Curated annotation (Swiss-Prot):
Membrane topology classification: Multi-pass membrane protein
Recorded GO MF terms: neuropeptide receptor activity; orexin receptor activity; peptide hormone binding
Glycosylation positions in this chain: 14, 22, 202
GO annotation, biological process: cellular response to hormone stimulus; chemical synaptic transmission; circadian sleep/wake cycle process; feeding behavior; locomotion; neuropeptide signaling pathway; phospholipase C-activating G protein-coupled receptor signaling pathway; regulation of circadian sleep/wake cycle, wakefulness
Protein name: Orexin receptor type 2
Disulphide linkage map: 127-210
Claim: Disulfide bond is one of the keywords in the record: yes
Length: 444
């Protein structure tokens, strides 16, 4: 928006404060200089009506909303419909998709509205609920990614220490949601609605903001430092360490029955196929080596996909995490003159957070053959369903037309047969031989 940005962050994550506007607003943004109607018209023209570049932002949010919603729902349906896809890793992926669906439905629309209109239109209750759900979904996503990394680390690096099962995965998912709901309760407690212009509170809801209200200056700093460490930095460091060990295990290891160490190069692994001589592996040993190579290939694909998911998550959440710490902890952007740039940074970082929810299904589609097949099957069913409905209409139309034509033909044939029958009867009567020279009618 042109002019001063009333709230640099969306309500869901509450990444900036609107209370500082009174210190930085432009001189002409003073309601006492105008009558109420004129001032409200000015607000609509300068702040509420989307500018040209904000239409691009709206289009970007719509694309993310559609892709994130459809993609993550398809992920859940694919695992639910196919028993062979109900693995430990896929259970966690479904949980990640559920968190993405939650944040897409509940928080994305509110974020877009506030970023464009600079106003919280949704009341006091949703001012507490929506930010709470946002932080819960962030916590669920981070803890789920951490559980995936931990599960892969145990399965690949220490397979004998811990055995993952579907039941344990489901129990872990329940614990993740319970822990996330508990630790994010402070976010719901501190959120409050307020208005920038109290004199207009009875006339309009414009410039009502949903922001944190703390009892002192030290508490928000402590909270946001802990939030940054718990939901971003600490889990990210642990996951990076886990995947580094997984990488070393899968790409730099000695395969029994092969002649050399598997290098970091991503070359396809081939079992030894020379003729067996003294000391050469037996056929059963070769089969075991081939099975192990096949398992390593599958684990490489899975690890590669999960590493990319983690990398995309880190990139998408990095800008808003840094901006949040700079603003909440160090008090930056409170007296900046270039608020348009600050607004652009915050707005883009908000969009990146939601784009992460849309990116995950795309990653699964490109890097997982099973998910790709299920996505294709789902779209094929939709397309075939439309095609079948069109064919049914055409078939019914053809059947109706053919029925009418058949009925007309039958009636026409019946008339022709009737006429032919009459002609045959009359002809047969007229050609009877005359008796005693009498005419044909004399026999009656």
């Amino acid at each position: 928006m042109s002019g001063t940005k009333l709230e640099d962050s969306p309500p869901c994550r509450n990444w900036s404060s609107a209370s500082e506007l009174n210190e930085t607003q432009e001189p002409f943004l003073n309601p006492t200089d105008y009558d109420d109607e004129e001032f409200l018209r000015y607000l609509w023209r300068e702040y509420l009506h989307p500018k040209e570049y904000e239409w691009v932002l709206i289009a970007g949010y719509i694309i993310v909303f559609v892709v994130a919603l459809i993609g993550n729902v398809l992920v859940c349906v694919a695992v639910w419909k196919n028993h062979h896809m109900r693995t430990v890793t896929n259970y966690f992926i479904v949980n990640l998709s559920l968190a993405d669906v939650l944040v897409t439905i509940t928080c994305l629309p509110a974020t877009l509205v506030v970023d464009i209109t600079e106003t919280w239109f949704f009341g006091q209750s949703l001012c507490k609920v929506i930010p709470y759900l946002q932080t819960v979904s962030v916590s669920v996503s981070v803890l789920t990614l951490s559980c995936i990394a931990l599960d892969r680390w145990y399965a690949i690096c220490h397979p004998l220490m811990f055995k993952s099962t579907a039941k344990r995965a489901r129990n872990s998912i329940v614990i993740i949601w319970i822990v996330s709901c508990i630790i994010m309760i402070p976010q719901a407690i501190v959120m409050e609605c307020s208005t920038v212009f109290p004199g207009l509170a009875n006339k309009t809801t414009l410039f009502t903001v949903c922001d944190e209200r703390w009892g002192g200056e030290i508490y928000p700093k402590m909270y946001h430092i802990c939030f940054f460490l718990v939901t971003y930095m600490a889990p990210l460091c642990l996951m990076v360490l886990a995947y580094l060990q997984i990488f070393r295990k899968l790409w730099c290891r000695q395969i029994p029955g092969t002649s050399s160490v598997v290098q970091r190069k991503w070359k396809p692994l081939q079992p030894v196929s020379q003729p067996r001589g003294p000391g050469q592996p037996t056929k059963s040993r070769m089969s075991a080596v081939a099975a192990e190579i096949k398992q390593i290939r599958a684990r490489r694909k899975t690890a590669r996909m999960l590493m990319i998911v983690l990398l995309v998550f880190a990139i998408c959440y990095l800008p808003i995490s840094i901006l949040n710490v700079l603003k909440r902890v160090f008090g930056m952007f409170a007296h900046t003159e270039d608020r348009e740039t600050v607004y652009a940074w915050f707005t883009f970082s908000h969009w990146l957070v939601y784009a992460n929810s849309a990116a995950n299904p795309i990653i699964y589609n490109f890097l997982s053959g099973k998910f790709r097949e299920e996505f294709k099957a789902a779209f094929s069913c939709c397309c075939l369903g439309v095609h079948h409905r069109q064919e049914d209409r055409l078939t019914r139309g053809r059947t109706s037309t053919e029925s009418r034509k058949s009925l007309t033909t039958q009636i026409s044939n019946f008339d022709n047969i009737s006429k032919l029958s009459e002609q045959v009867v009359l002809t047969s009567i007229s050609t009877l031989p005359a008796a005693n020279g009498a005419g044909p009618l004399q026999n009656w």
